[in-house]
Swiss-Prot record:
This is D-lactate dehydrogenase [cytochrome] 1, mitochondrial. SUPFAM superfamilies: FAD-binding/transporter-associated domain-like, FAD-linked oxidases, C-terminal domain. Residues 146-327 form the FAD-binding PCMH-type domain. PROSITE patterns: FAD_PCMH. The gene is DLD1. One of its GO terms (cellular component) is mitochondrial intermembrane space. One of its GO terms (biological process) is lactate catabolic process. Its EC number is 1.1.2.4. The lineage of its organism: Eukaryota, Fungi, Dikarya, Ascomycota, Saccharomycotina. Catalyzes the stereospecific oxidation of D-lactate to pyruvate. It catalyses: (R)-lactate + 2 Fe(III)-[cytochrome c] = 2 Fe(II)-[cytochrome c] + pyruvate + 2 H(+). Belongs to the FAD-binding oxidoreductase/transferase type 4 family. It is an enzyme of class 1 (oxidoreductase). It comes from Saccharomyces cerevisiae (strain ATCC 204508 / S288c). InterPro entries: FAD-bd_oxidored_4_C, FAD-bd_PCMH, FAD-bd_PCMH-like_sf, FAD-bd_PCMH_sub2, FAD-linked_Oxase-like_C, Oxid_FAD_bind_N, Vanillyl_alc_oxidase_C-sub2.
Length: 587
């Protein structure tokens, strides 16, 4: 009995972990599960199962002189409990708040260590106010941070190995990290929610190169900071193109993180269909390459699918191999106007259902056409101010293209179009498509020229193609009734559309919020999604829960904490991982 009382006294100051401790005492706190078990964890494991008081006493004495203190051990054990190893999903209520570093002296020391990783050269980091502001918000962002929500420093690494060292230091010191590339996202994706201790890692300055081009295999490996327009320019010289075309300024890393698409997605797919492999640095600094270069593989889990669309919450993508597509031998642009948005949307649905293969199918409402004229963003300012469809029609020869034009025209006429214009040459093709590419900027420029305080709420939803005309028509009526400046742009071929709403006052902001809420719920009721390509970020977390339900979101949370148990990667995005998250309305 004496040895039992002795054991009880020895264990009590450390923890009372019960059965869970026995199962998980040797858990390694890293993004992957490899590596050796430290001596303190081995002691704890064997102390519970030991049948000999002598052996127990020896191991306990050994622990007293080991590198780790009892407090360190307890901290690790408590973190295991938070991950909840028993269940397949993880509820927010089962978590405590993450233990980020807040000590200013220690933060300064970590920042100096991070600078040393980059050679302590001023061009490799910045804490200038203008840079901190630019890496926290944009005027076209839908959700804005408070003045205090700024990164502590911005780092500009040159290599994957430097990114690995940066993340290892941040992981070891519980410092939040926000990945950054083009900064064109719209739902607060790169907003630093944690005040005073966030590190922003920007790949755009130095990691923006082509690594390897395999023309015979139609793929290209690039660094994550390469703008997609630069990639397209590079490929164009070889008669090729990149399949995705998101907003101007977007970079490959952000395209992956946000699962971007754009106007060409109808023909070439979204980012997840255009990825072959990725190099990713996990939160603890582990470097992972998702696979080699096959166009298909059934080997193991689909790691590409896990990281595409993860919004920087699971790691930092540093390189990617993406598909190249052969440019159409012949292509034209057709512009077709309708009296109502319902007719225009119905035309898009009918074309999709007919099996006519088009390269792009875009819808702009009459308000957008008016704003394009008013902003003088294009060479011509006499666009018909009615709901308008823009088509890219391509093929292997002019004859094939002309036949497709006739088919599109026939469907458009069945849906009561009142004008049909198509480009006769390349210059006219660029002129006609230009109106589509400047849509967002036209809304911003047209109103900000009159009122500098104007802000824009930009959002998107996607619905099954058969529901597109109904949902877009109801959304249009709702926005028109609000009396706010608004416009709609749709990727009509895949049922995805965007709403642009301008506001100035807190009251108008609240009106915007209600309009967006009804728009999203309308899409969900039609079996659609709260976002087709903008992503969740901060702005649509509540809708993700409404769209999928608790169990899928709890599963995502489980995956997040399995890879990032310290919750350092882009905190508070997609779904909550802190039950005591600081309140902020992000206006």
């Amino acid at each position: 009995m004496l040895w039992k009382r002795t054991c009880t006294r020895l264990i009590k100051p450390i923890a009372q972990p019960r059965g869970r401790l026995v199962r998980r005492s040797c858990y390694r706190y890293a993004s992957t599960g490899t590596g050796s078990t430290d001596s303190s964890s081995q002691w704890l494991k064997y102390s519970v199962i030991a049948s000999s008081a002598t052996l127990f006493g020896y191991l306990f004495a050994k622990n007293l002189y080991s590198r780790e203190t009892k407090e360190d051990l307890i901290e690790k054990l408590e973190m295991v409990k938070k991950i909840d190893p028993v269940n397949s999903t993880l509820k927010l209520s089962s978590l405590d708040s993450p233990d980020y570093l807040h000590d200013p002296v220690k933060i300064d020391k970590v920042v100096e260590d991070l600078k040393q990783v980059l050679g302590n050269k001023p061009e490799n980091y910045s804490d200038a106010k203008s840079d901190l502001d630019a890496h926290s918000d944009t005027y076209f962002n839908t959700h804005h941070p408070s003045p205090e929500q700024r990164p502590r420093i911005i780092l500009f690494p040159h290599t994957t190995e430097e990114v690995s060292k940066i993340l290892k230091i941040c992981h070891d010191n519980n410092m939040p990290v926000v990945p950054f590339s083009g900064g064109t996202s719209l739902e607060g994706h790169f907003l630093p929610t944690r005040i005073g201790d966030t590190i922003t890692v920007d790949l755009s300055k130095f990691m923006n190169n082509v690594v390897k081009f395999d023309k015979l295999d139609l793929d290209i490996t690039v660094q994550a900071g390469l703008p997609w327009e630069d990639l397209n320019d590079y490929l164009s010289d070889h008669g090729l193109m990149f399949g995705c075309d998101p907003g101007p300024g977007a970079q490959i890393g952000g395209c992956i993180a946000n699962s971007c698409s754009g106007t060409n997605a109808y023909r070439y797919g979204t980012m997840k269909e255009n990825i072959i492999n990725m190099t990713i640095v996990l939160p603890d600094g582990t470097i992972v390459k998702t696979k080699k270069r096959p166009r298909k593989s059934s080997a193991g889990y689909n790691l590409n699918g896990l990281f595409v669309g993860s919004e920087g919450t699971l790691g930092i993508v540093t390189e990617a191999t993406v598909k190249c597509h052969v440019k159409p031998k012949a292509e034209t642009v057709a512009v077709v106007s309708f009296d109502t948005i319902k007719d225009a949307a119905a035309c898009a649905s009918n074309l999709t259902q007919s099996g006519i293969h088009l390269n792009a199918m875009e819808l702009l409402d009459e308000n957008m056409m008016k704003l394009i004229n008013a902003s003088e963003s294009t060479d011509r300012c006499d666009w018909v101010e009615k709901p308008t469809m823009f088509f890219k029609i391509g093929g292997r020869s002019p004859n094939i293209v002309n036949a497709l034009v006739d088919e599109v025209k026939a469907v458009a006429q069945l849906n009561h179009c009142n004008s049909f214009q198509f480009a006769k040459d390349d210059d006219e093709k660029l002129e006609l498509w230009e109106a589509r590419k400047v849509a967002l900027w036209s809304v911003l420029d047209a109103d900000k020229s009159k009122d500098k305080s104007a802000k824009i709420w930009t959002t998107d939803v996607a619905v099954p193609v058969s529901q597109f005309d109904k949902v877009i028509h109801e959304t249009k009526k709702d926005m028109q009734a609000s009396k706010l400046i608004n416009a709609i742009v749709g990727h009509a071929g895949d049922g995805n559309f965007h709403a642009f709403i301008v506001y100035r006052t807190p009251e108008e902001h609240e009106t915007c919020s209600q309009l967006v809420d009804r728009m999203v719920k309308r899409a969900l009721n039609a079996e659609g999604t709260c976002t087709g390509e903008h992503g969740v970020g901060i702005g649509k977390r509540e809708y993700l829960l409404e769209e999928l339900g608790e169990a899928p979101v709890d599963l995502m949370r489980k995956i997040k904490l399995a890879i990032d148990p310290k919750r350092i990667m882009n905190p508070d995005k997609i779904f909550k991982t802190d039950p005591n998250e600081p309140a902020n309305d992000y206006r």
